[in-house]
Regions:
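Short secondary-structure boundary motifs at beta->alpha junctions and helix caps
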Residues: 60, 142-198
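A structural "domain/chain start" motif
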Residues: 14-96, 170, 196-199
Length: 199
């Protein structure tokens, strides 16, 4: 796969937004064959590790997977390149068939999912960070400033071959934007790069 790296650093009088994105494209894949896609809820791991009292921590909102999946679906729908199945329609269709998005995340049986939704490819993702990063003091108080951090990966997978068509890695931080605003900016800029490379 061909890889593109994009680094952004926006400075203003009151804040700095750091953005790093990696874009991987499978150059050998016949991209024109992908016409209709569906975005399923991104995987949000449960971190059961106990961290040091003095180590930096980043919270992950429990609904981060659904939020980022919806943002990604909306951004892809703007392209006009794909027919994107509405996120609500995906949820309702799977519910009618007594299926859950979580089941496909664990089994990665995208062929069955593709048949159920009538799509050529599915967009899957994994959330690694989505919230505020802080370093606790021994007293239990937080050190300032608090920094919003988001980090996640997105992959477009062919439902027939399970082959990755393209993938992006998005990571960023901000001292002023909340996780939703920051994610929206990151997705918009990263997918603009992806669109350019695919055309």
């Amino acid at each position: 796969m061909k890889k593109y790296a994009v680094l952004f650093l926006l400075l203003s009088s009151c804040a700095a937004i750091n953005k790093v994105s990696d874009v991987d494209i499978n150059e050998n894949f016949p991209h024109d064959e992908i016409q209709k896609i569906a975005v399923i809820m991104f995987e949000t791991p449960v971190d059961e590790k106990k961290s040091s009292m003095f180590s930096s921590k980043t919270s992950i909102a429990p609904d981060a997977g659904a939020i980022l999946a919806s943002m990604t679906a909306r951004e892809l729908a703007k392209w006009g390149k794909y027919v994107v199945v509405n996120r609500q329609a995906v949820e309702e269709e799977l519910k009618l068939k007594n299926l859950k998005e979580d089941d496909f995340l664990h089994t990665q049986n995208y062929l069955n999912l593709g048949k159920q939704l009538g799509v050529d490819a599915v967009i899957v993702g994994r959330v690694e960070g989505f919230g505020v990063s802080y370093k606790p003091k021994s007293t239990g108080m937080f050190l300032s400033p608090l920094v919003t951090k988001v980090s996640f990966t997105v992959r477009c997978v062919d439902v027939t071959t399970n082959e990755t068509i393209w993938a992006v890695k998005i990571k960023g931080s901000s001292t002023t934007d909340n996780e939703r605003v920051l994610s929206s900016k990151l997705i918009s800029e990263t997918f603009a790069t992806l669109k350019t490379k695919l055309n």
